[in-house]
Amino acid sequence: MLETTMGEASPEDPPLNLKSLSQPPQKRSRTVEDFNRFCSFVLAYAGYIPTPAKEERAWTPPSSVSPHRTEESDGWDSPDPPQLPAPPEPPQPPATSDISTIETFVMKAKSQGAGGGSSKMPGGQEDGAEEEEVQAKKGSRRKRRQRHRGGVRMSDTDTDEEEREERPAAPGSLPAPQLPPSAESSRDGGGSSSDADTQVMDEDIMVESGDDSWDLVTCYCEKPFAGRPMIECNVCCTWVHLSCAKIRKSNVPDVYYCQKCRAGRLPGATTPKADSAP
């Protein structure tokens, strides 16, 4: 009785097949070979290496083998028939997320190969070289100015003119109109004896600097002749600059009296006007 009871299986115990099916299959850990297969597939997809004749999905692990297969096998069971090797499946295109990952990997590899692994662009170096050239040109201009000055401080007008020369003209801006020399001389002739009048008169110098009368001082302004146009007084025969006498070159009178002779003459006498309108 004991043998029969021990030999018989209780109806409450589940069969062995149900025990093995109820347990989840164990996941196999990835190996170096799996990683190499994945890399070779990515390189073949990107076109870096030729596609092998037999492709396998590297990221799909082979079917897990249940460890309870040996327990299921029994001496009384019939042996499994030999299975023929299945034909290789055609390569399936990877999912969309896998494609985006592969494309990102390929783009990074191409950018690193083209740029030599450097992320800096050569444009920054070119900009720095241009700035250095500009600074060097400015320094040479300053040295030239110091040489021309010779220890004397330049006037504000000269500094402004140099700044205008250094500053590039804006596109679309027109140059300032320049008046002819005749207009400038006529405009400056009726004014007071200022530096501007002297500069205008200097343009009409008719005598060379080697003449003996170049340094002759006769005018009451105590300035030399220096080749500037002058007029002679009819009384004292003193030569006076036209700018000091306030006479225009286009309206030189035939008779001229200097300031001293004009003041010493009789009050009833009439004197020709030097500043008659043209």
UniProtKB/Swiss-Prot annotation:
SUPFAM superfamilies xref list: FYVE/PHD zinc finger
Pfam families per record: PHD
GO biological process, one term: positive regulation of protein ubiquitination
Keywords, in A-Z order: Autophagy, Cytoplasm, Metal-binding, Nucleus, Zinc, Zinc-finger
Record's compositionally biased regions (Pro residues): 79-94
CDD domains found in the cross-reference section: PHD_PHF23 (cd15631)
Chain positions covered by the region annotation Disordered: 1-31, 50-198
GO molecular-function term, one example from the UniProt record: zinc ion binding
Any one cellular-component term (Gene Ontology): cytoplasm
InterPro entries, per database record: Zinc_finger_PHD-type_CS, Znf_FYVE_PHD, Znf_PHD, Znf_PHD-finger, Znf_RING/FYVE/PHD
Location relative to the cell: Nucleus; Cytoplasm
Zinc finger residue extent: PHD-type: 216-264
Gene3D superfamilies membership: Zinc/RING finger domain, C3HC4 (zinc finger)
Ranges of compositional bias, category Basic residues: 138-151
Biological function: Acts as a negative regulator of autophagy.
Domain remarks in the Swiss-Prot or TrEMBL record: The PHD-type zinc-finger domain is required for negative regulation of autophagy.
Record-given protein name: PHD finger protein 23A
Organism: Xenopus tropicalis (Western clawed frog)
